[in-house]
């Protein structure tokens, strides 16, 4: 347990979170602009959850020894990983059990104070259909891979929530 406490208070732990999520975001942009796979509105929402993980890693890496910074990072991490898993599962259900009554919107519904689709339409404007499964790897769709990734982030969050929020009194090497 003490190793988890120590690791959660190191900048490298938070940078691993940030760069792994950055890799997912880079993959999404590769699929969109190199492989020409159009993202659906649910894919855009999942992309926002990945950005939440990037932000969580960035916040946590600023000053990981301070409890309040770890708390903010852990909060962003928990919300983003759970929300991403929920969205990935909903999209998987739409693709696995297609129904004409269960479709997704063509336009994202971002809050008026944060219209990401207007600010950065090249990243946050959906152009695809939720029911399409344009890519698979090892018999799993992109949606299933994102679900696996978010479940992994959620499990890692659950492993780190308790040790990450424990207060560890700094030791004085001169005493």
Curated annotation (Swiss-Prot):
<dbReference type="Pfam" id="PF02600">
    <property type="entry name" value="DsbB"/>
</dbReference>
<dbReference type="InterPro" id="IPR023380">
    <property type="entry name" value="DsbB-like_sf"/>
</dbReference>
<feature type="transmembrane region" description="Helical">
    <location>
        <begin position="72"/>
        <end position="89"/>
    </location>
</feature>
<feature type="topological domain" description="Cytoplasmic">
    <location>
        <begin position="1"/>
        <end position="13"/>
    </location>
</feature>
<keyword id="KW-0249">Electron transport</keyword>
<keyword id="KW-0813">Transport</keyword>
<comment type="function">
    <text>Required for disulfide bond formation in some periplasmic proteins. Acts by oxidizing the DsbA protein.</text>
</comment>
<comment type="similarity">
    <text>Belongs to the DsbB family.</text>
</comment>
<dbReference type="InterPro" id="IPR050183">
    <property type="entry name" value="DsbB"/>
</dbReference>
<keyword id="KW-0812">Transmembrane</keyword>
<keyword id="KW-0472">Membrane</keyword>
<keyword id="KW-0676">Redox-active center</keyword>
<feature type="disulfide bond" description="Redox-active">
    <location>
        <begin position="40"/>
        <end position="43"/>
    </location>
</feature>
<dbReference type="GO" id="GO:0006457">
    <property type="term" value="P:protein folding"/>
</dbReference>
<feature type="transmembrane region" description="Helical">
    <location>
        <begin position="14"/>
        <end position="30"/>
    </location>
</feature>
<keyword id="KW-1003">Cell membrane</keyword>
<feature type="topological domain" description="Cytoplasmic">
    <location>
        <begin position="164"/>
        <end position="175"/>
    </location>
</feature>
<keyword id="KW-1015">Disulfide bond</keyword>
<keyword id="KW-0560">Oxidoreductase</keyword>
<feature type="topological domain" description="Periplasmic">
    <location>
        <begin position="90"/>
        <end position="144"/>
    </location>
</feature>
<dbReference type="GO" id="GO:0005886">
    <property type="term" value="C:plasma membrane"/>
</dbReference>
<feature type="transmembrane region" description="Helical">
    <location>
        <begin position="49"/>
        <end position="64"/>
    </location>
</feature>
<feature type="disulfide bond" description="Redox-active">
    <location>
        <begin position="104"/>
        <end position="130"/>
    </location>
</feature>
<keyword id="KW-1133">Transmembrane helix</keyword>
<feature type="topological domain" description="Periplasmic">
    <location>
        <begin position="31"/>
        <end position="48"/>
    </location>
</feature>
<dbReference type="GO" id="GO:0015035">
    <property type="term" value="F:protein-disulfide reductase activity"/>
</dbReference>
<dbReference type="GO" id="GO:0009055">
    <property type="term" value="F:electron transfer activity"/>
</dbReference>
<dbReference type="InterPro" id="IPR003752">
    <property type="entry name" value="DiS_bond_form_DsbB/BdbC"/>
</dbReference>
<keyword id="KW-0143">Chaperone</keyword>
<keyword id="KW-0997">Cell inner membrane</keyword>
<feature type="transmembrane region" description="Helical">
    <location>
        <begin position="145"/>
        <end position="163"/>
    </location>
</feature>
<protein>
    <recommendedName>
        <fullName>Disulfide bond formation protein B</fullName>
    </recommendedName>
</protein>
<feature type="topological domain" description="Cytoplasmic">
    <location>
        <begin position="65"/>
        <end position="71"/>
    </location>
</feature>
<dbReference type="InterPro" id="IPR022920">
    <property type="entry name" value="Disulphide_bond_form_DsbB"/>
</dbReference>
């Amino acid at each position: 347990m003490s190793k988890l406490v120590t690791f959660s208070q190191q900048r490298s732990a938070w940078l691993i979170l940030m760069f792994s999520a950055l890799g997912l975001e880079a993959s999404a942009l590769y699929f969109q602009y190199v492989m020409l796979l159009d993202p659906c509105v649910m894919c855009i929402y999942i992309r926002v959850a990945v950005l939440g993980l990037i932000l969580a890693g960035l916040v946590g890496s600023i000053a990981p020894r301070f409890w309040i910074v770890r708390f903010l990072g852990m909060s962003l991490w928990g919300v983003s990983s759970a929300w991403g898993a929920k969205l990935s599962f909903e999209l998987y259900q739409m693709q696995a059990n297609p129904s004409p009554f269960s479709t997704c919107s063509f336009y994202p519904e971002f809050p008026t104070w944060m219209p990401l689709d207007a600010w950065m339409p090249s990243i946050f404007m959906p152009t695809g259909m939720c029911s399409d499964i344009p890519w698979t790897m090892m018999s799993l769709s992109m949606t299933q891979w994102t679900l696996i990734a978010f479940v992994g982030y959620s499990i890692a969050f659950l492993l780190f929530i308790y040790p990450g929020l424990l207060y560890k009194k700094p030791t004085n090497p001169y005493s």
